[in-house]
Curated annotation (Swiss-Prot):
SUPFAM superfamilies: Adenine nucleotide alpha hydrolases-like. The keyword Ligase applies. Catalyzes the ATP-dependent amidation of deamido-NAD to form NAD. Uses ammonia as a nitrogen source. HAMAP family: NadE_ammonia_dep. Deamido-NAD(+) binds at residues 140, 173, 180, 260-261. This is NH(3)-dependent NAD(+) synthetase. Belongs to the NAD synthetase family. Pathway: Cofactor biosynthesis; NAD(+) biosynthesis; NAD(+) from deamido-NAD(+) (ammonia route): step 1/1. GO terms for cellular component: cytoplasm. Mg(2+) binds at residues 52, 165. It comes from Streptococcus pneumoniae (strain Hungary19A-6). Homodimer.
Length: 274
């Protein structure tokens, strides 16, 4: 089996999907998880205004609406939380996403003071914090905020990881990679767009250029620029298609470099890193 085939199998990507079936699959998955854990009553998710959190948020909201209708338990709620660092440049996009999601509860936790305090505390030891490192601190503070809210509201944290992000390791370890449940896992980027289209999202919600937007020196840096490969190439690879040798090498290099992000902390029994 080729590495491409191994990755596709591991991530569970289909070459072609039925968008309605995948919507139902994700909603039912979220509902089953809460039914299995009756002490959980909420899902919490940070909403950035990008495609992934918009899709995951809408699926979570639909799951909660169905659970309330099926059980008569009005304590089932979806909590959408904005997590800006100061003022977010594309706040209007986040508000469009919230208008589409229509969450039961919408909160704002501004992470700027927490991030700046942690950065200052680390630098006080004589250890410089690079802009890239500070970007990861932002992602991890967002994770802390979501888990704090989940802890306050008997909840679980939803993650937005999907196949095109997972294969490249394009997430912060213990940051946006920290979550309890991943309703988009198995979908590539274009398939996520198909689900949003089926859900009736306006084009602006899925045509926006993807960006992690964590670095202040490079605001709004496009994912594709940071990765050195396009999402179209990543999606083609995940669908089993032939792409250029250069793009394939780039994708597979990211796969190898990001292996540690997909695993629990390394033990003496692990050898994948050797």
């Amino acid at each position: 089996m080729s590495l491409q085939e191994t990755i596709i199998q591991e991530l569970g990507v289909k070459p072609v999907i039925d968008a309605q079936e995948e919507i139902r699959r994700s909603i039912d998955f979220l509902k089953r998880y809460l039914k299995k854990h009756p002490f959980l009553k909420t899902f919490v998710l940070g909403i950035s205004g990008g495609q992934d959190s918009t899709l995951a948020g809408r699926l979570a909201q639909l799951a909660m609406e169905e659970l309330r209708a099926e059980t008569g338990d009005d304590s089932y709620k979806f909590i959408a939380v904005r997590l800006p660092y100061g003022v977010q440049a594309d706040e209007a996009d986040a508000q469009k996403a919230l208008a589409f999601i229509q969450p039961d509860v919408s909160l704002v936790v501004n992470i700027k003071e927490s991030v700046d305090a942690m950065t200052a505390a680390v630098e006080a030891t004589g250890s410089p914090v690079s802009d890239f490192n500070k970007g990861n601190i932002k992602a991890r503070c967002r994770m802390i905020a979501q888990y704090a809210l989940a802890g306050s509201h008997s909840g679980a944290v939803i993650g937005t990881d999907h196949a095109a992000e997972n294969i490249t390791g394009f997430f912060t370890k213990f940051g946006d990679g920290g979550a309890d449940i991943l309703p988009l896992y198995r979908l590539n980027k274009r398939q996520g767009k198909q689900l949003l289209q089926k859900l009736g999202a306006e084009p602006a919600l899925y045509e926006k250029i993807p960006t992690a937007d964590l670095e202040e020196d490079k605001p709004g840096l496009a994912d594709e620029v940071a990765l050195g490969v396009t999402y179209a190439e990543i999606d083609d690879y995940l669908e089993g298609k032939t792409i250029s040798p250069e793009a394939q090498a780039t994708i597979e290099n990211w796969w190898h470099k990001g292996q540690h992000k997909r695993r629990l902390p390394i033990t003496v029994f692990d050898d994948f890193w050797e």
